[in-house]
């Protein structure tokens, strides 16, 4: 039973005890039901002279008969009672009314609010600090991983082999330190896992816990600092003391950026408390006292905000980058997650891996789970390839909103908008191949053209950037050509935003503007935590020049898209008409449609396709017999 359940039982027992105590006191002040007689019967006995003596206590009368039996009764307001008793020779004893009950009630009424507040405060303090030690604010919240339950090992980790090898060495050191110490090697004091969200940093830590036969403590960076001053530093000290007592051991700090940010940034007591906590952590990790056998493993997706003193060797000796997996890594990750579900032997993980560039391990796990839910919803006995393809489209493009009712005019406008994207993407050879075009609303978009690269891309060439900007502007251009400038809509807002950001990065980050030159100007968002590279460092003339160059690049892409769509207006009409009729077209179907001006009967009977291979390069001259592909224009250097 957990601590919360035990606390509830304790308070329930206390409540029942108070109720019983109240009843005991109450019963003492009430008339006993033993030998109780009515007041009329009592008067009759008095008149018959069978009553020997009575004791009057308020309204309660207790008496003794001549035969020695006792009785009791409750008297109403009867002024002549004493005279009647005297006339019948009854011995009378009068005592004051019982005041014990009133005193107890008065005590409860006066002290109950204060006792209630104290009880609530103690209860919450016990909840905050582990069910005991009500004054143990400074105790560490690090949890020792239990041996119970299924263990995660390195076999469950795939796609990040380099990071796994680095951490395997640490596990081997903890298991057999003599192997390394005989050459004079020392165990690394700390290891920092760096990478975007979902790449498997926490999973690696769990795998280390499953592999290493040493105590494993886990804590979050946000668990150190709370509302009381000095609590964070105290918890850091207690955590390392706990580690020393269990050495050799591993302490895992997740999201260390919550406590390890740059010092001296910001103002206020909360910030001072965080800095005090960080200072204590720096001392404990590499101070005068040795922490032999205590290995710190931390994870963060914001290494840029961490304090430099925390990152130096001697504290975090190793910084391991856990990046998104490549195509081979994605295939291995899919195989790991597919083992946990019932799937068809016809599934080819390599095809799904090829169509999910940039996916993290968490996103691939979610994709497999979505495919499983889709198969279960359709009462299938196993997950099939089509379910994975549909789940991929759902994750990448959003959920289909088929219930959304679109007017014919809106549907036509969306078809030409998406057709413009697809056609320009088809003719810009530097652009990624088209995976799918649809006018079915998905997420917040009324339609979408999905393009996927043939292979993993680790850098982006300039001609692809220019092609992507042209493809982004093609939707707005298609609306202007078909419906006129006065009829254009706000549907291109996200496209314009994407094109502007790309152009700005070309000028300020990548030095691709001849006028601005290969100078890094950075973005204003970088000064959030570091106060470096702020846009305010630029001169006014430089900012104006950057704006001019950004506008020039976007306008060049706009002109390229307009040139392509104007020359191939007939193909735009064909593509838009097919989108209106079938709603969804794969890249291969668009290729066949524009090369032969018709669809094969087999394709026509299977609309809409769930997905098509994203590895088909569709902008080829032999496939487009009536149109010559146009390459993206280079930026005017004048």
Swiss-Prot record:
Residues 523-544 are annotated as: Disordered. Residues 1-4, 125-638 are cytoplasmic. Its cofactor is Zn(2+). Keywords: ATP-binding, Cell inner membrane, Cell membrane, Hydrolase, Membrane, Metal-binding, Metalloprotease, Nucleotide-binding, Protease, Transmembrane, Transmembrane helix, Zinc. The active site is at 418. The keyword Thylakoid does not apply. PROSITE patterns: AAA. It comes from the Bacteria. Residues 26-103 are periplasmic. SMART domains: AAA. The keyword Metal-binding applies. Binds 1 zinc ion per subunit. Pfam families: AAA, AAA_lid_3, FtsH_ext, Peptidase_M41. Its EC number is 3.4.24.-. In the central section; belongs to the AAA ATPase family. In the C-terminal section; belongs to the peptidase M41 family. Homohexamer. PANTHER family: ATP-DEPENDENT ZINC METALLOPROTEASE YME1L1, METALLOPROTEASE M41 FTSH. This is ATP-dependent zinc metalloprotease FtsH. It comes from Rickettsia bellii (strain RML369-C).
């Amino acid at each position: 039973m957990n601590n919360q359940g035990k606390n509830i039982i304790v308070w329930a027992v206390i409540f029942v005890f108070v109720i019983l105590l109240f009843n005991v006191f109450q019963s003492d002040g009430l008339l006993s039901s033993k030998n109780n007689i009515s007041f009329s019967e009592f008067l009759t006995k008095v008149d018959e002279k069978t009553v020997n003596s009575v004791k009057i206590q308020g309204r309660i009368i207790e008496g003794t008969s001549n035969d020695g039996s006792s009785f009791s009764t409750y008297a109403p307001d009867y002024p002549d009672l004493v005279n009647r008793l005297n006339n019948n020779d009854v011995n009378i004893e009068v005592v004051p009314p019982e005041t014990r009950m009133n005193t107890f009630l008065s005590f409860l009424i006066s002290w109950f609010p204060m006792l209630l507040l104290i009880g609530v405060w103690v209860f919450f303090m016990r909840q905050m600090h582990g069910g005991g030690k009500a004054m143990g604010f400074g105790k560490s919240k690090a949890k020792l991983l239990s041996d119970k339950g299924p263990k995660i090992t390195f076999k469950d980790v795939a796609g990040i082999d380099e990071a796994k090898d680095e951490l395997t060495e640490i596990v081997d050191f903890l298991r057999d330190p003599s192997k390394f110490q005989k050459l004079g090697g020392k165990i690394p004091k700390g290891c920092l896992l760096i990478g975007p969200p979902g790449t498997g940093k926490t999973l690696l830590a769990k795998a280390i816990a499953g592999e290493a036969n040493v105590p494993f403590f886990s804590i979050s960076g946000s668990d150190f600092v709370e509302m009381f001053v000095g609590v964070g530093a105290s918890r850091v000290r207690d955590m390392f003391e706990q580690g020393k007592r269990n050495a050799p051991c591993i302490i895992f700090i997740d999201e260390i950026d919550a406590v390890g940010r740059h010092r001296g940034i910001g103002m206020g007591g909360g910030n001072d408390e965080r800095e005090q906590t960080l200072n204590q952590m720096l001392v404990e990790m590499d101070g005068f006292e040795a922490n032999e056998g205590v290995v710190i493993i931390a994870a963060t997706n914001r290494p840029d905000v961490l304090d430099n003193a925390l990152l130096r060797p001697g504290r975090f000796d190793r910084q391991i980058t856990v990046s998104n997996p490549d195509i081979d890594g994605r295939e291995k990750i899919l195989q790991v997650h597919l083992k946990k579900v019932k799937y068809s032997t016809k599934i080819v993980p390599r095809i799904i891996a090829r169509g999910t560039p940039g996916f993290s391990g968490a996103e691939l796990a979610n994709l497999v789970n979505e495919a499983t839910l889709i198969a279960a919803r359709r009462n299938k006995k196993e997950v099939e390839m089509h379910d994975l393809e549909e789940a991929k489209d759902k994750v990448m493009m959003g959920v289909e909103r088929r219930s959304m009712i679109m007017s014919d005019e809106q549907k036509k406008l969306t078809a030409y908008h998406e057709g413009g994207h697809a056609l320009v993407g088809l003719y810009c050879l530097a652009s990624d191949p088209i995976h799918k075009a649809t006018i079915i609303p998905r997420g917040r978009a009324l339609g979408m053209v999905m393009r996927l690269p043939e292979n993993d891309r680790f850098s982006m060439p300039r001609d692809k950037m220019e092609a992507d900007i042209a493809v982004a502007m093609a939707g707005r251009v298609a609306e202007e050509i078909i419906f006129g400038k006065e009829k254009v809509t706000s549907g291109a807002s996200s496209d314009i935003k994407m094109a502007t950001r790309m152009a700005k990065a070309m000028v300020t980050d990548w030095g691709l503007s001849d006028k601005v030159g290969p100078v890094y100007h950075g973005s204003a968002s970088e000064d959030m935590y570091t106060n470096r590279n702020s846009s305010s460092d630029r001169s006014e003339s430089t900012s104006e020049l950057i704006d001019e160059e950004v506008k020039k690049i976007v306008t060049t892409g706009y002109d390229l898209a307009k040139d392509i769509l104007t020359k191939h207006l007939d193909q735009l009409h064909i593509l838009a008409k097919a989108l209106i009729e079938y709603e969804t077209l794969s890249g291969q179907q668009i290729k066949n449609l524009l090369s032969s001006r018709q669809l094969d009967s087999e394709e026509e009977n299977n609309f809409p396709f769930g997905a098509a291979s994203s590895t088909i390069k569709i902008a080829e001259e032999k496939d487009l017999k009536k149109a010559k592909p146009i390459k993206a224009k280079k930026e005017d250097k004048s």
